[in-house]
Amino acid sequence: MSERYFENREFISLQLTDETIKYFEFIDCTFIDCTVEKCTLTKCRFSECAFVNCHIADVKSDGTEVNYLTFENCILSGINWGLLISSGGFSEPINKLTNCTMKYNFFTDMNLKKFSFKSNGITHTTFADCNLSESKFDGCNLTDTEFFRCDIQKADFRNATGYKVDVITCNIKKARFSVPEVYNLLDSLDIKIE
């Protein structure tokens, strides 16, 4: 099997469903109006690529690494981002999100310090064991999005809605919240307020 290498290329309207993609490397590439669903990425690498108006759903990874990806106006569903961290662990998969919808995603053991999720929709998603200190979630729809064993010190949740933060396992010191959503922090304490 020969490797496939692409640098500074543009891919438009690429449609992939139920495919196994092996040994591809994409550096500084742009994907526009592409759909990738139920695919397995085997030993691929995506570095500093941009995705615009793309739909990526239920993608599985087998030794694939991604770093510094940018997403704009994308729908991202069923992705376990923690499994896509590069082997050196020095960079995170996502560099920037703009006007994206994320649903059923998993972020585990990731350093997302100072990351801006601002004004993106992130629903039914789990953040576990992540460093989210000083991150921005302001204006986000976070319906049924859970935070467990995360550092969210100084994170900004103002005007965010629907989040579930386990205050027992998360460090929330100096995080910013808005009323009435801040009352959601009490959910993990299993108490009643009358």
Place the predicted regions along the sequence by residue.
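Tandem repeat scaffolds
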Residues: 1-194
